[in-house]
Amino acid sequence: MRSYPLSEADKIVACLTPDYGLIRLVAKGARKIKSRFSGSIEPFSVGEIAFYRREDAELGILRSIELKQSYFHLAKNVNMVAALAYFGELLADFSPPHEPNENLYRMARACFKAVAGVSDDQNKMGAGVLYFELWILRLTGYLPASNVCGECRSPIRPDESVVWSSENRFLCELCAPVGRGIILKPQQAVLLSLARKLAPEAFIAQSVYKREFLKPHSAITRKLIKQVLLRDLEYWSEKNWEAVEL
């Protein structure tokens, strides 16, 4: 997901794996010009790794990596780099070290691939970012169900508005405080249902026709993420949404 200097010659590489969760490995000699890791440990690369780590150690040793897929060619697209770096930041924050989560790994790979395929389309990129936010919150247990009222527990009908309250719950119209919270009208709330049912590519394709609805949902995910992490996000932020045509 990312790498950073450890010493004059070495780097620390953060990797998300299906079997070991988030791991941090020392790539010895990676900062040297003729490093055997040259070009293979760039951010967002996909590959098969061999490593060694003692059970009680925070860092392991990267033995080798066989590169399967690289997104390095996207580095010239500033907004794309911001989106993918944002994915990496969220994964680093929401993935406990050494705790496997295959669903999270598969979701992350699917989203990286989907967003990398939208080129310079800002609307599609924004939809992909929203999908990733919704799913990382859902898979880590922070996103409540949007089809059931968090107060009265009644099902929320497809023709009914949904309100996101300050208590981080989705409420039906009857339980929601008047004039408070983020209101999602029925045609807006449908995006939450689509995100649950569709793969990222299909969600992006559907959302491009509902792009005016992306910002309210993003406001919800950003508020929730900020409350969970207790800090503002570094990469993809409101400035990136300003580029999305609404």
Named regions from a protein language model:
Residues 1-12, 16-246:
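Non-catalytic alpha-helical scaffolds and adjoining flexible linkers that form interface surfaces
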